[in-house]
C-alpha cells in the first residue's frame, strides 16, 4: 500500500487506534487491502450500532452487496448453510445463504429493513426462525484467527469491531465510483475524508495484532 497516500492518517499503529476510536464514536472506517489482492476499500461499521443513515450511505455509494460479517459460532447458531459447498471464488470469500429478518421488514430492500435484518441476526438469543432465507443481506463467515489467518476484509471487520469492544459482527460494503467502477485507494481516502471515516489497511491491522499478541505472550 502506498504509504504516502496514508501518511496524513498517522503511522500504521496510529491508524488502527484511530479506527478503533472511530468505531467507538459511532463512525465508519474505510478498510483498504493490498494492491496485489482485491485492491479495494470497504466501508465497515459495527453491526450493533450501525444506523439507518449509515446503511443508506453504504447502499448509495457501495456495490449494493451489503454484507454482515459473522463468526462460525454465529453461523451455526443461525443454522445458515454456506452458499456453496465447493467455494471456487478467487479469494474463498465465505458467503452463506442470504437473509431477511422474519419480522419488522417489508420487502427487505430499504436501509431500515436491512438494519432490522442485521440486528435480528446478531441478537443474543437469535434463532434460525428469526430469519427468512433468501434475503437482501449477505452474511460472510470469517475465518478463526482473523487477519492473522486470512487477510480479507471479512476478517478485518471482525477483528476491528472486536478490538473496539463490540460483538464480533460487522457490516461491510465495497466502495464504488459514481461510474460503477471499483474505488481504488485514492478515491477511498478522499471519500473517507469527506464522510469523517478513519482509514486503515489490513496490513496495518496484521502488524498491530502481531505486536500486541507478542507483547501478551
Swiss-Prot record:
Its EC number is 4.1.99.12. D-ribulose 5-phosphate binds at residues 37-38, 42, 150-154, 174. Mg(2+) 1 binds at residue 38. The gene is ribB. Pathway: Cofactor biosynthesis; riboflavin biosynthesis; 2-hydroxy-3-oxobutyl phosphate from D-ribulose 5-phosphate: step 1/1. PANTHER family: 3,4-DIHYDROXY-2-BUTANONE 4-PHOSPHATE SYNTHASE, GTP CYCLOHYDROLASE II-RELATED. One of its GO terms (cellular component) is cytosol. Keywords: Lyase, Magnesium, Manganese, Metal-binding, Riboflavin biosynthesis. This is 3,4-dihydroxy-2-butanone 4-phosphate synthase. It comes from Citrobacter koseri (strain ATCC BAA-895 / CDC 4225-83 / SGSC4696). Its cofactor is Mg(2+); Mn(2+). Homodimer. Mg(2+) 2 binds at residues 38, 153. GO terms for biological process: riboflavin biosynthetic process. It catalyses: D-ribulose 5-phosphate = (2S)-2-hydroxy-3-oxobutyl phosphate + formate + H(+). The record marks 136, 174 as: Essential for catalytic activity. GO terms for molecular function: 3,4-dihydroxy-2-butanone-4-phosphate synthase activity; magnesium ion binding; manganese ion binding.
Amino acid at each position: 500500500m502506498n504509504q504516502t497516500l496514508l501518511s496524513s492518517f498517522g503511522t500504521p499503529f496510529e491508524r488502527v487506534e484511530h479506527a478503533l476510536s472511530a468505531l467507538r464514536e459511532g463512525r465508519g472506517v474505510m478498510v483498504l487491502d493490498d494492491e496485489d489482492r482485491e485492491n479495494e476499500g470497504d466501508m465497515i461499521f459495527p453491526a450493533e450500532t450501525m444506523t439507518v443513515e449509515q446503511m443508506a450511505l453504504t447502499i448509495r455509494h457501495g456495490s449494493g452487496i451489503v454484507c454482515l460479517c459473522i463468526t462460525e459460532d454465529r453461523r451455526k447458531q443461525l443454522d445458515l448453510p454456506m452458499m456453496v459447498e465447493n467455494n471456487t471464488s478467487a479469494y474463498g470469500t465465505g458467503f452463506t445463504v442470504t437473509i431477511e429478518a422474519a419480522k419488522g421488514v417489508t420487502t427487505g430492500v430499504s436501509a431500515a429493513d436491512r438494519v432490522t435484518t442485521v440486528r435480528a441476526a446478531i441478537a443474543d438469543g437469535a434463532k434460525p426462525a428469526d430469519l427468512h432465507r433468501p434475503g437482501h443481506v449477505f452474511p460472510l463467515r470469517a475465518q478463526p484467527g482473523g487477519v492473522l489467518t486470512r487477510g480479507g476484509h471479512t476478517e478485518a471487520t471482525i477483528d476491528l469491531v472486536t478490538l473496539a469492544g463490540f460483538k464480533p459482527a460487522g457490516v461491510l460494503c465495497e466502495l464504488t465510483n459514481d461510474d460503477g467502477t471499483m474505488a481504488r485507494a485514492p478515491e477511498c481516502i478522499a471519500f473517507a475524508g469527506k464522510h469523517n471515516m478513519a482509514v486503515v489497511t489490513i496490513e496495518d491491522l496484521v502488524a498491530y495484532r502481531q505486536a500486541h499478541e507478542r507483547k501478551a505472550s
